[in-house]
């Protein structure tokens, strides 16, 4: 199997010969790109342009780098996963619920932060959004004030929406080293994004414009998984499609958490 660098070199040559929009067939196994060809080879192929394939490999390289993010710590010590919900997206809703279950499977202790009453109708209102963040962040500081972060061998932050801003800001301000899963981040999230983070965004998310999220993720080298036509909950309204989305999303989450 070729390395990512070898695949990118092949793609650059093919793009010069046939153009960036030439269709090829990407071969994947367990969600990992293994190569590409000009004829479909079932069942592990998807049709894709050379340009999109190039972007897919870049994202996979970032994902592998984020998954393998490590820091000096006692790996035999307990592991802690902290859940940072959104304003209306609580810890028992699908993305956070299943991500928490995966973390528990890998022997993480689970701690869910909860917020008190926050301003309503904050969408599109910068002042209310700022107030909601400040209130939720203050409550987060209080909820986590007694934790000895140095006593844990591995730390994982799992967050959603405004919770991605809170989690990233908290980790940055307290210099907490660990991995972070960002479900439907906001643009403000990337002001604090740190190494070892991955993000998930729906292209129909009314809370965050896709081009802005894509640009910010690239600037911070945060691997970004885009779900076409999905909203702020990574849902489309089609039950079967939504079940497929949660399955694909959790496969990425599982690999990310499982990587030492």
Label the model's feature ranges.
Residues 18-50:
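Acidic, low-complexity, intrinsically disordered interaction modules
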Residues 63-151:
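Serine-hydrolase catalytic machinery in alpha/beta-hydrolase-like enzymes
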Residues 87, 203-206, 229-231:
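Acidic beta-to-alpha connecting loop that harbors the catalytic carboxylate
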Residues 158-167:
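Gly/Ala-rich beta-loop-alpha elbow adjacent to hydrolase catalytic centers
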Residues 176-185:
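A conserved short beta-strand
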Residues 199-201:
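Short beta-strand/loop motif that positions the catalytic acidic residue
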Residues 206-212:
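Conserved alpha/beta-hydrolase "acid-adjacent" motif
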Residues 230-244:
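Catalytic histidine-centered segment of alpha/beta-hydrolase-like enzymes
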